[in-house]
Amino acid sequence: MSRFGPFPDPSALLDHDEAAHAFATMLDGGARDEQIAAFLVALADRGETMVEIAAAAQAMRDRLIPIEAPAGAIDVCGTGGDGHHTLNVSTAVSIVVAACDVPVAKHGNRAASSKSGAADTLEALGLDMERADRQAQEQLADLGICFLFAGTRHPAMKRIMPIRKAIGRRTIFNLMGPLANPARVTRQLVGIARPAYVPVYAEALHRLGTDHSRVISGDEGLDELSLAGGNEVAVVTPDGVRMQRSSAADAGLPTRSLAEIRGGDAAFNARALRRLLEGETGAYRDAVLYNAAAALIVAGAVDTLTEGVEEAAEAIDKGLANALLNCWIAYK
């Protein structure tokens, strides 16, 4: 038997059936740890294809613990792992967009490589993570926002996590979070940390099915729209994938350096997010407005980035986003 055990040799491109069987076997406990590790590393070395990414995501979708989301619900989620250690932009964007009357089923986890992931920052703000995940269905219906904790929503991943940790490098599972939202949303703003992979990832999302999503990556390898330079953007609809470029100027915002939105630990990031929602101006606000504008386009709430910036800014300046966060924390 080869070192890959029940898996096909990943030096050759896998077709859909091969990839689907491989990831089903992996998630269902049909291979040894060392075989899984060898397969994942070889796949990463060769470079994952659209077919393989979609098959892995579908295998995770088939095994998650779901909730029902209202029509038009969106997710704003990044793959993480970009190494820039910025403030929690997608978390703040989720709150701001929900305050614009767009239901948001936020899928996230604790930090893997940064100091503070979405779950860490929200906990530091006072959100009871266990209760939030348990009451996600009710919170989404009552508040228009919920947090779906990846650590509990994907029980099949519990065996894979220590293997990923032992590998100690990026694998296909670093791309999976946004593609396996337990609310099964069909509108997403997805950030990835690999600009060159935007078209591949977008084709995988198209294969899985979406009403309107955008896959974004800053030229610096940022897993969100960057104010520092250009951005790769893939617009994904049932008709296919359309590539475009975007910069802060398109949203009427100034260029900002990544150093201006450098984050810290959960407490640091939570304080920054609270100040943002209380009306503090600066680079963090601009980054949130830029990404929120893109999310509002995905939701069908606005047609242009400048309109989206105006709507998001209004939700902050009128205190709607801060009030929503307070209600979310206090929800019983």
Swiss-Prot record:
Mg(2+) 1 binds at residues 90, 224. It holds the Pfam family Glycos_transf_3. Its cofactor is Mg(2+). GO terms for molecular function: anthranilate phosphoribosyltransferase activity; magnesium ion binding. Anthranilate 2 binds at residue 164. It comes from Sphingopyxis alaskensis (strain DSM 13593 / LMG 18877 / RB2256). Homodimer. The lineage of its organism: Bacteria, Pseudomonadati, Pseudomonadota, Alphaproteobacteria, Sphingomonadales. It is an enzyme of class 2 (transferase). Mg(2+) 2 binds at residues 223-224. Keywords: Amino-acid biosynthesis, Aromatic amino acid biosynthesis, Glycosyltransferase, Magnesium, Metal-binding, Transferase, Tryptophan biosynthesis. Coiled coil: none annotated. The keyword Nucleus does not apply. This is Anthranilate phosphoribosyltransferase.
